[in-house]
Structure formats: C-alpha cells, structure tokens
Amino acid sequence: MAKKNIKQKKDNRIAIDVKKHIKKVDVGVFGGTFVFTSPLSIAELAPKLNKSTNEIIMRYFKKGVVYNLNTILDEEQIGELCLEYDLDFKIEKNVNTENLLENIAFDDLEADLVARAPIVTIMGHVDHGKTTLLDTIRKSSVTASEAGGITQHIGAYQILKGDKPITFIDTPGHEAFTEMRARGANLTDIVILVVAADDGIKMQTEEAIDHAKAANVPIIVFVNKMDKYEANPDKVLNQLSAKEIVAEELGGDIVFVKGSALKNEGIFELLDSILLIAELNDYKANPNRLAYGTTIEANLDKGHGPLATLLVQNGTLRKGDYLVVGSTYGKIRNMFDEYDNEIEMALPSKPVKVSGFEEVPTAGDKFLALADEKQARAIANDVKQKKIRLERSMLQSSDIRAKIANGELKNINLIIKADVQGSLEALKGIFNSINIEGVTTTLVRSAIGTISESDVRLAQTSDAIIIGFNVRANRIIKDLADSVGVQIMNYDIIYKFKEDLEAWMKGTLDPIIVEEVIGEAKVLKLFKHSQVGTICGCRVINGKIKRNALVRVLRDGIVIYNSKIATLQHNKDSVNEVIADKECGLTIANFNDVKENDIIEVYVKVEKNHDEVK
C-alpha cells in the first residue's frame, strides 16, 4: 500500500537573529558625545575622554574632594564630568548571550502588528478582595483553597467580554510578596487598584500605587465591598486624591468603579472601562514571529515535571517550540490554558502553562522561542555560568562567615523547599526584611520540590533547619531526619514562617542580664560588733530582702557601694528573707561605712531574652 505524503505546515514565524542583537559598545567620544556602559575608575575614564588622570583628579581636588586613580565614578558623576568638558553623554549596554533575554528589541513593521488583549494586573491591600474580584470575573473560586485566605502565588487568566479577550494577573497581597507585585506591575498594561470601601487605603495600597506609577501604566480604581454597612467611598476618594490618584468626578483622570466583587456588582462597568482604555492605547503585537515573554510562575509538578506559567508578550508560542527561559531551556512537550485544557498555540497576551524544561524556571525570567535546541541550550548555559559567577563573587566579598567564626555574629542556617517559585522568592525575601543586630541567616539551599535525603544530609553537615513550604517529607525522610537530629519545619502560610524566623533569630542571641529590684530597706539604727562589723537595724519599706542577695547602698539617692547581704536576722533569728513592713538586722559584705537613713536596695540579676526587654 502506498504511503501517504504528509506535508508539514510551513512555519513562517520570524525568528530572532541572535547575532544581530549581540552588541559590544565602544567606549569613547564620538561626535561630541561620550558613550559609556557602566561606572569607570578614573584610570579607565581619563584616556577615553582624551584627558590625563591628573587633570581629572585635580578637578575634584579643587572642589574639596580627594580622589585617586582607582576611584570609581558612577554614571551620574561621569555625566556631570562630561558636561564640564562640554560633551554630551550616552549610556549604552553591552549585550551578549548572558543578558540577551533582558535586552531583546523588536523591529516589527506597523503592518505586521495586530491588536492584542490588554494585560491587567489586580493589586491592592491584603483581604481587600482582589482574588474574589478575579474569581467573580472568571466565574470560579480558588480563594477557599488558599491557606489563610491569602493568595500565595500569582495566577494569570484570560477571559472574554463579549468577543474581546482580557488577560488578568492576580498578585498576592501579603507584605512578603513585594517583588511579585512589582513584577506584575512591570508586565501589565493596566493596573486595577482594589480598595475596600469599609477600610480605605493601607500599606499595600500605597505600594501598589508606587508600582503602577513606576511602570507608567493607567490605573483603574475598583472601590470594593460597597455592600458593607460601613462602606465609605468618599473617604476612599479623598485618601487616594491625597496620593495624586484623583477620580474623574473630582476633576482628575482616574476611572473609579464602585461595586462589590462578592455580590457581582460593578463588574461589567469595570470590564467596559478596561476595554475602553485598551482601545485608547491601541495595544498591539506581532503574532507572526517566534514568541517572547515572561515567566509568571513555576513549579515542579508530579505528572509533568518542571512546569511554568508563561505570558506571551509578542509572537506566537506553539507546542514543540524550543525555549530558553533564564538559565534553563527545553522543548514544549505540553501546553495548557488557564483551565488546564491542552492547547497547540498561544497568541500575544495569552497566559499558558508549559512543560518540557530541563529544570524549573525562575519566576520573572524572560523566555524566548528559538529555531533550534542547540542555540537554546547554549544561551541557557551562558546565563547559568553568569549566575554562578555572581554567587561566587557575593560569597567571596561577604565577611559574614568570618564574623560568625569569631563569634561577632550568631547564625541560623536554613534549607528551604517550596512548591512554587513565587513562594520560594517570598520566603527568601523575608531574610532581607528581618534585621536583628548580631544575628544573620545563611540560606544553604533553596529549591522547588519535596524534601529529599540530600536535603537532610546537607542539613546534617551544615547544622541547618529544613523549611518545607507547601511540601512535605515522606516517612522515610522524616525517620532519617529524626535519627540524625535534623529539624524539619512545615508551613503553608507565609507570615507564620516570618514570625518563627524572627523568634529563632532572637533566640540565638545571648540572653540579656537584667537587674530587678526586689526590695528596699531603710537603715534606722547602727550597731557595732567586733566580729561582724556594722550591723544595720532596718525596716523593709518595699518588697522583700534576701540573705546573700545583691545590694546597692544609696545615700541621698546616690549609690555609694555595691555588695551583697552577708547576714540577715529577724527577732535575733537567722532567716533567709524578710518581707515589707518588718524589721531586721543585716550586715553588708566588706562594707561598714553605713549611716542612718541610708537606703539598702536589694536586687537580683535575671537572664531575659530579647523579646522581654523593652
């Protein structure tokens, strides 16, 4: 039987010309403009400006600043120096395979561009209803499955309003996820700022405003929870006006939509506002090229291995494409939409879940589809080598280990395993947010996946605590950890981990010795004794006094001697303590120069942890 000829459909998508994007900047003066790439030492800068090093050093010396050949001048200083020499200046960037993905520049013709869905990021304070709003829009709910009612990682979804698609990115509201919210703002075309009408603006509201302004994107305010009795939308409008987010009804240019995500009120008006802004801004992309975009989320999936949620920002992504994503690469084996339906392709602004990577990508990494696997592997390897060099450089430049070794710092070693990259980032970010003098944390290992035998062995040798966030160790691994004395701590709520880490860090500090006054006695009469010296006849005026307790002798409010009680009697009997309003006789070790009306302050030294000391 004759074989059928199966024709492969020709792929007409444009591939990035990697060589064309590689650029090495020539540093120097060209046509009255000094072109440079980064901070330079005076020794490096002078010949490029056609000046002597002495001339530049003397310029600063005359300003009262002493520099030498090795002094590094930053970009601003170089710019100022250029202006003094009547030169314009321009900062350019060297582009190589190590930083190619962050420096892709498309030269698409206007005729090749088509309208794409707006990318909308929902931001706002924790518990103000962002996820509920997105759930209402999607007609589904994931809120109940999120521990503590806080969205633990970014989700990206595309919906239809009529026949027009809108892509939504949901960002976590908790303080630990600042980096993820910043990433969401930088990916987006429009920010939806959700503010609860019964609560007003809060910390993350202000942070979201800052991110949106930094990204220079339009803002729509959704005043949520209007169904609440305590709702006060005017308060919200006034608070936001003070932050230069002025509603149209108050003479500004910001669209405000009032409603209730829970009651499905104001949703259609919100969607219409998004589409209106999208139409005005005319968002476009070229679907006829290999895809480029950003990794939204990544995790290790039991069924599919390394899995990443990708947002296509330009081009079309197809099943079977070769991808480089940060320091990893792969060939797309499976592609799923936001509802886990397997699909063959994704157009611009489409979020998809993709499998087929060699390793779990890092959330926030750019991705690029390439014509062949060899090229993808080579670029990924170059990026990986750059990361290794940076890590080694940071380790070598840090003096933390030396301080730990000589006792200047206390240290906690941690191994963190998490279910998804976004959560891992947030946990790592907590280290930067906690600052307790004298204590540091060392992250021995951080990775996505379950807790393994190698984690336990590493924890054993490095004296580390293993943190599992939404991942667990199986019984065999738990038994191994118990047998070698390794502690495994499991979490599913980010702020619980933060609380515990703070407690551990404070717990590693040496206890603070605090003096606590337990009693006072007033000297009423003095008796001289040939063997024991001066006996003080006292009345306890406050608290109690104890034999062998530490004392301060105060005269007119001034401490004149520190010692301890040598003997203590009550009614001629030796006793261990005497309470308030009772009289006693006592002697003070090695001190006889006591006078009537002196106050004997009795105190003890107590060890306290740092939380107890205010």
From Swiss-Prot:
List of residues binding GTP: 124-131, 170-174, 224-227
Gene Ontology cellular component list: cytosol
Localisation per UniProt entry: Cytoplasm
Region (G4): 224-227
Transmembrane segments: none
Region: G3, residue numbers: 170-173
Domain tr-type G per the UniProt entry, residue ranges: 115-283
Region (G1): 124-131
Record region (G5): 260-262
Location of the region described as G2 in the Swiss-Prot/TrEMBL record: 149-153
GO molecular function, one term: translation initiation factor activity
PANTHER family the record matches: TR-TYPE G DOMAIN-CONTAINING PROTEIN (PTHR43381:SF5), TRANSLATION INITIATION FACTOR IF-2-RELATED (PTHR43381)
Function: One of the essential components for the initiation of protein synthesis. Protects formylmethionyl-tRNA from spontaneous hydrolysis and promotes its binding to the 30S ribosomal subunits. Also involved in the hydrolysis of GTP during the formation of the 70S ribosomal complex.
UniProt-recorded name of the protein: Translation initiation factor IF-2
Organism: Ureaplasma urealyticum serovar 10 (strain ATCC 33699 / Western)
